[in-house]
Amino acid sequence: MVKALLVGSKVLIPNVDESRYIYSNGFYGKAIGISKPKGPKDIIRPLELSLIESVYLAKKGLIKVIDKNGEVLEYEKLYEYSSKIINKFDIMYRVYEDLREKGFIVRSGVKYGADFAVYTLGPGLEHAPYVVIAVDIDEEITPHELLSFGRVSHSTRKRLVLALVDRKSESVRYIMFKWVKM
């Protein structure tokens, strides 16, 4: 199991060989100081994982997260810690996990004004065809919010997907929007 260190809102894998291994198994994380690796061979520095990625990898048994006191944070504790730091973590994690289980590569979508950028092949191999916004199915979305979501996806030439999470059933439904010329 790969050793990872919890540092605030990030998790670091200091060993480069272990970083390369984790990256090669699904494009997880970002190598520190390397902006756009083309593949695992370009991972020559420690890897930085988001909390969402870390919780997922801990649940899968691929990483062991250790806090500053040397305590190992099992999946449940890491999930609880992440929930305190990230707004709507439960909703976002449920969508992340669902997309990963469906075989997609899921990265942060912050630069696109979304929760996630989603790839079918992976970063460096294609541009992300989708941006995903995670939403609680019981929350209302205003027309203004919907328009602003759509503008971002249109200006970046990506398809907008709303991921609707039902907390009761833990199911996720997806609605995709596409711009058309008329």
Swiss-Prot record:
List the source organism.
Saccharolobus islandicus (strain M.16.27) (Sulfolobus islandicus)
Q: Which GO CC terms are listed, alphabetically?
A: cytoplasm
Task: Spell out the InterPro entries in the cross-references.
Answer: tRNA_endonuc-like_dom_sf (IPR011856), tRNA_intron_Endo_cat-like_sf (IPR036167), tRNA_intron_Endonuc_cat-like (IPR006677), tRNA_intron_Endonuc_N (IPR006678), tRNA_intron_Endonuc_N_sf (IPR036740), tRNA_splic (IPR006676), tRNA_splic_arch_short (IPR016442)
Signal peptide extent: none
This chain belongs to which protein, by name? Answer: tRNA-splicing endonuclease
Q: Which Enzyme Commission numbers does its entry carry?
A: 4.6.1.16
User: Quaternary structure?
Assistant: Homotetramer; although the tetramer contains four active sites, only two participate in the cleavage. Therefore, it should be considered as a dimer of dimers.
EC main class here is: lyase
Write down the CDD domains for this protein, in alphabetical order: tRNA-intron_lyase_C (cd22363)
Q: Which HAMAP family match?
A: EndA_short
Highest rank taxon of the organism: Archaea
GO MF entries: lyase activity; nucleic acid binding; tRNA-intron endonuclease activity
Pfam family of the protein (one):
tRNA_int_endo
One GO BP on record is:
tRNA splicing, via endonucleolytic cleavage and ligation
What keywords are annotated for this sequence in UniProt? Lyase, tRNA processing
| Taxonomic classification | Archaea, Thermoproteota, Thermoprotei, Sulfolobales, Sulfolobaceae
UniProt KW RNA-binding keyword: no
Q: What does this protein do?
A: Endonuclease that removes tRNA introns. Cleaves pre-tRNA at the 5'- and 3'-splice sites to release the intron. The products are an intron and two tRNA half-molecules bearing 2',3' cyclic phosphate and 5'-OH termini. Recognizes a pseudosymmetric substrate in which 2 bulged loops of 3 bases are separated by a stem of 4 bp.
* Reactions catalysed, as given in the entry: pretRNA = a 3'-half-tRNA molecule with a 5'-OH end + a 5'-half-tRNA molecule with a 2',3'-cyclic phosphate end + an intron with a 2',3'-cyclic phosphate and a 5'-hydroxyl terminus
| Assigned protein family | Belongs to the tRNA-intron endonuclease family. Archaeal short subfamily.
The active site lies at 119, 127, 158
